């Protein structure tokens, strides 16, 4: 029998969080292509927990596997503080948001590694302009079959999670009209968006083998869906979120994803289930989430009606209520009620711009919010 208690040695639903940060010059407020200069020192401190990305103005970090949301918070705070400290030694800082409000992709340098040269060779301008930043959350799985079963039903909630995470309303100095322009940009890549459903782990593996055999991909990591079984970690990886600006938002979203997986697994164990919806209808909600975020309406396909997104976020928090106490994440999950009612990072960025008519002020506020409650590494 699967344990839902994180203290149990048999608890499978561990957490891992990956964040992609922007490297920024606090004077000009522009992105700086500087990751290679801080990477060596960063690896001495963080080892495999720091990685470069395609653009040199981005740095990726990843937590160790965590059993509780409190462990995950400590890891995220440590990683943000370390990267911010390394950047500060070079007169720079970091931002966590889905896009940079003013910088252009045309001014960015590509990281000179063979992997990234291959990406640019294949994707051409699509790769060069993919100056976006996300947060990925890994939830451990008991086995491959369970991962597919849970992916099939958890897909329904991806637009809800996206709406809560939106942090990319600006792009190259323009108000895009989207709450998550990052999602719109990423949709230009192949094998992105809401995943299809699969009848079994074997069917999914046959799909992967077909793509590899026909030279579509050379590795299952090039399946970039919003939710996927990770090919090496034994996790279900949520990839739908914009980068979370505040640590509190990052941790609340991760807690929700863990609780959602546990709730759905509990339903399976009690011989109840959640309907598997077609990708086409979930995509309708994803469009609404990336366009209007929490200010719009999503479709409740059970009721066959539009419902205010904010109301559905309250329903989602209530849906996972029976598991959050055992997981020890009630406080973190219920923080999302504040986000639902008060707005996401995208809403706050837009509010700053309305007040100041100055995107530099938006950048300044993002710098402050990214490091709220984060001791900056002084080594």
UniProtKB/Swiss-Prot annotation:
GO BP annotations, alphabetical order: modified amino acid biosynthetic process
Family: Belongs to the glutamate--cysteine ligase type 2 family. YbdK subfamily.
UniProt cross-references to PANTHER family, sorted A to Z: GLUTAMATE--CYSTEINE LIGASE 2-RELATED
UniProt xrefs under InterPro entries: GCL_type2/YbdK_subfam (IPR050141), GCS2 (IPR006336), Gln_synth/guanido_kin_cat_dom (IPR014746), YbdK (IPR011793)
Uppermost EC category: ligase
Top-level division of the source organism's lineage: Bacteria
Name under which the protein is recorded: Putative glutamate--cysteine ligase 2
E.C. number(s) listed in UniProt: 6.3.2.2
Species: Roseiflexus castenholzii (strain DSM 13941 / HLO8)
Role noted for this protein: ATP-dependent carboxylate-amine ligase which exhibits weak glutamate--cysteine ligase activity.
Pfam families, sorted: GCS2
């Amino acid at each position: 029998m699967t344990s839902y208690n994180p203290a149990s040695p048999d608890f499978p639903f561990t957490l891992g969080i990956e964040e992609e940060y922007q490297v920024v010059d606090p004077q000009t407020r522009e992105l700086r292509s500087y990751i290679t200069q801080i990477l060596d020192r960063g690896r001495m401190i963080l080892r495999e927990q720091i990685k470069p990305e395609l653009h040199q103005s981005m740095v990726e970090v990843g937590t160790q596997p965590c059993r509780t949301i409190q462990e995950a918070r400590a890891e995220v705070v440590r990683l943000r503080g370390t990267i911010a400290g390394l950047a500060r030694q070079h007169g720079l800082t970091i931002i966590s948001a889905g896009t940079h409000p003013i910088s252009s992709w045309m001014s960015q340098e590509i990281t000179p590694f063979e992997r990234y040269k291959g990406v640019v060779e294949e994707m051409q301008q699509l790769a060069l302009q993919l100056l976006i930043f996300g947060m990925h959350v890994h939830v451990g799985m008991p086995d491959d079959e369970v991962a597919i079963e849970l992916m099939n039903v958890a897909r329904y909630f991806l637009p809800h999670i996206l709406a809560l995470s939106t942090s990319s309303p600006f792009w190259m100095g323009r108000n895009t009209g989207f709450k998550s322009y990052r999602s719109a940009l990423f949709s230009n890549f192949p094998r992105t968006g809401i995943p299809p459903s699969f009848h079994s782990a074997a069917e999914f593996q046959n799909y992967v083998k077909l793509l590899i055999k026909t030279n579509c991909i050379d590795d299952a990591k090039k399946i970039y869906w919003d939710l996927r079984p990770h090919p090496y970690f034994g996790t279900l990886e949520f990839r739908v979120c914009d980068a979370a600006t505040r640590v509190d938002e990052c941790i609340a979203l991760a807690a929700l994803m863990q609780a959602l997986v546990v709730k759905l697994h509990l339903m399976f164990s009690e011989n109840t289930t959640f309907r598997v919806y077609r990708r086409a209808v979930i995509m309708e909600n994803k469009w609404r989430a990336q366009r209007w975020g929490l200010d719009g309406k999503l479709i409740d396909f059970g009721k066959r009606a539009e419902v205010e997104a904010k109301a559905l976020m309250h329903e989602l928090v209530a849906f996972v209520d029976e598991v959050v106490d055992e997981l020890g994440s009630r406080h973190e999950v219920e923080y999302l009620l504040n986000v639902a009612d008060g707005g996401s990072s995208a809403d706050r960025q837009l509010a700053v711009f309305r007040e100041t008519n100055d995107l530099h002020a938006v950048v300044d506020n993002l710098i402050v919010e990214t490091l709220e409650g984060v001791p900056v590494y002084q080594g």
